[in-house]
Structure formats: C-alpha cells, structure tokens
Amino acid sequence: MEKVKIIGGGLAGSEAAWQLAKRKIPVEIYEMRPVVTTPVHKTEYLAELVCSNSFKSTELTNASGLLKEEMKKLDSLLLRVAEETRVPAGVALAVDRELFAKRVQEILLESPYVTVIREEVKKIPEEGIVIVATGPLTSSDFAEHLIEILDTDSLYFYDAVSPIIYADSINYEKVFSASRYGKGEEAYLNCPMTKEEYERFVEELVNAETVESHYPGEEKFFEGCLPIEVLARRGIDTLRYGPMKPVGLIDPKTGKEPYAVVQLRPENIQKTLYSMVGFQTRLKFQEQRRIFRMIPGLENAEFARYGVMHRNTYFYAPKFLKPTLQFIKNERVFFAGQLIGVEGYMESAAMGIVAGINAARLYKGKPLIILPPTTMIGALISYVTTKVPVKQFQPMNANWGILLPLERPVKDKKLRNRLLAERALRDLDDVIRRFAINV
C-alpha cells in the first residue's frame, strides 16, 4: 500500500498525519531532528513548541477561540492533547510544553498507520502524495530546493510585519484619505502629526521595551529592513524623512503638509483592516499598543495583529497554491503550516488539518474540500491563496477582519463577533455534513 509522505513533524505535520491515520491511510513522517538540529528545539519530540506555551483564547467571541472551535469540529489531535496537558491560564489555553509534545508523539506512534523516519529530506519526493510542512526553520538544503521549484523572489527567510489595525477602531475625524502628490486613488489613510506630537512619539519609541530574539544571529536578517525604533534612535528627524515623511500629502483641514504622517494601507478588499506602512518593529506588544495609540486617529486602535520581526521561512503562496492547499504545478503535493504564510501555532496546525483531509480525499479518489471564507480556517486559506501584490503579502493570524463581513452591518462589536462565529460554525457544519468529512 502506497504511503503518504509528510515532510516535517511540527504542528501542521502532526495534524496532517492524524487526519490520514484516522482514515486508515499509511503515513511516513520525515522529521530531521535529532539528526539535524535547530537553534531553538530542545527535544526530538514531534509538535514541539519552541516559543510560548499558550494557544491563546478559548472564548468564541475571540477570533482565536473561533479558530479552535472549528479545529475541534474537524477532530484536531493537538487540541485534544492540549486539554489533557493544560495548565492554568485564565481563558487562554496553555499547556505543559514537554508533556504536550511527548503525548502527541505517543498517540501518533501508537497508530499502526504512522511511521516516523528521522532524516533530513532535501527534495520533494518525485512520486506519491506529499505534504510539505517544514515550518519556519526549514533546513537550508530544502530551502534551496524550494527556490528551484518556486523562484528566488517568492521565498522569504524572515518576517518584517507592520501592525494591522481594525478599520472600525480608527477615528476618521482625525485622519484624511490621500495618495502622495494626489496620484492614483486616495488609497491611504493618513494620520497627521504636529511637531510636538511627533517629538513626543519619537521619544517614547527610543525608550520603549523590545523583544529579545529566540534565534541566535537573527539580527543579521534585518539589515535591509530596520525596525522603526532603531530608525528613531538614529536621530530625531530620521523617521519624518523615512516612513513618516509628509511630502506630497496635504491635510485638507490646514491646506498644508503636516509635520509628519503615519500612513495606513488597506489590507483587504473590504477595507476592514489597515496596516501601518513602514512600521515593522520589535517592540513588545504592550508597548506597541501604548505608543501607537499616541498617533492622532489611533487613540482607540484595536490591533488585529501586532508588528513582528523574526526568523521565518515562508513563500508567496497566492502564486503557487490552490484553495485545497495543493501545489499548482503538481497537484499531488500539498503545503501546510507557517511555510504558506499563516502566523501562529493554531493557524499552522489548522492548515495541517485541511492538508491532511484533502490528501486523504485525493488518496481515495474523493472530491477535495474548499472551506468557505465565512469560516476562520477558510478565511486564512483564502488569504494565503488570493493574489495580492507580492510586497503586500505578509503572514497572517486569525482575526475578525479576514472573515467575509455580515450581510447586514452590526455596530456592537461583541454582538458582531458572536454572529460571525455562529455563521462560521454553521457553515462549517454544512461542509462537514455534505462531504461526510468526519466519516
């Protein structure tokens, strides 16, 4: 019996293996550890957590909570084990990291359909169904292979992501729409600053707390893309001659160029999300919230995701992936996890679930599933498979802004989120029933 090969035994690879094994399809998981190590892994367990031990909120009124509820409906192995190895963390789901990874590995190895092979894979196998889930620390040899089958410009080795803000938390009385020199559509929202506001802002940036790196030598990846706090330390005017330059932008309230400007760019067609242009940062999340709320118009800003800069291997998925997570150039190959441009433990694991389900369906000659963008998992897949300009593509986590909006707008945020969650679970139940996914 031909075996499905999974390259990478992290969160996505483990979930994919579970989905195949439970359907009695033989699987080989290729995990390079401990033969080839990484700077951050401490054990040889599958599904090892290398950063936080938290999987975020479990509440349905939180986007992370909805994502987990959808994963449960699709029989997530990781969430089942997370409940077994849970540690107190309020409404968040946090785990004993070593017990968690150990138990995931035990369950997979107990299956007669799972074999774990401890060796580095340097190329995608030429035959059979394959799921690639090599993660943010993809080995250099396999990364070279990815460059060959993708192209040099489509593979990235670090994240430099600006914060993303919910549109409905912006104070539109203080911002204005305009593109520089009036060229093209008024695509950007502009937050104007006075000299006093700008200088206070820069002072806070200079003295803010930053995140320490998990990865040795990580800073060398960022030489061509400096964090705004580093730019701020180079001189009081550096930012306003860089990402905060006001040239070509006229504030309609004054008829003049502001002293400095923070530009916000739409992140999606619905314009429910805006990113802060040029604001890649390594500030701690609480510092981002505090300091960026000093910007006029962002006093009550709610963040769909915070800015991050860290080591991360991912590719420009919209050019290469179908909504089934199949590789456009070779449909027997699936991709999953952080490699395709999702951000976060559960987001990566969810991609593994879908890749595993669809690999199983391909194996059995059944039609593959595409989850609707009204579901959180479907919306994440839609995000990483919908073409946008290459420079605008950046890893995304679960948030309400990527879901299709409700047919009728709802102003109350809690009610809106609850209605979005109810619709998502209803639509997912419909797909599960129609395709007999859990049978």
From Swiss-Prot:
Record SUPFAM superfamilies: FAD/NAD(P)-binding domain
Coiled-coil region: none
Enzyme class: transferase
InterPro entries the record matches: FAD/NAD-bd_sf, MnmG-rel, MnmG-rel_CS, MnmG_N, TrmFO
Enzyme Commission number(s): 2.1.1.74
Compartment annotation: Cytoplasm
GO MF entry, a single one: tRNA (uracil(54)-C5)-methyltransferase activity, 5,10-methylenetetrahydrofolate-dependent
Cofactor: FAD
Catalytic activity: uridine(54) in tRNA + (6R)-5,10-methylene-5,6,7,8-tetrahydrofolate + NADH + H(+) = 5-methyluridine(54) in tRNA + (6S)-5,6,7,8-tetrahydrofolate + NAD(+); uridine(54) in tRNA + (6R)-5,10-methylene-5,6,7,8-tetrahydrofolate + NADPH + H(+) = 5-methyluridine(54) in tRNA + (6S)-5,6,7,8-tetrahydrofolate + NADP(+)
Gene Ontology BP, a term: tRNA wobble uridine modification
Function: Catalyzes the folate-dependent formation of 5-methyl-uridine at position 54 (M-5-U54) in all tRNAs.
Name of the protein in question: Methylenetetrahydrofolate--tRNA-(uracil-5-)-methyltransferase TrmFO
Lineage, uppermost ranks: Bacteria, Pseudomonadati, Dictyoglomota, Dictyoglomia, Dictyoglomales
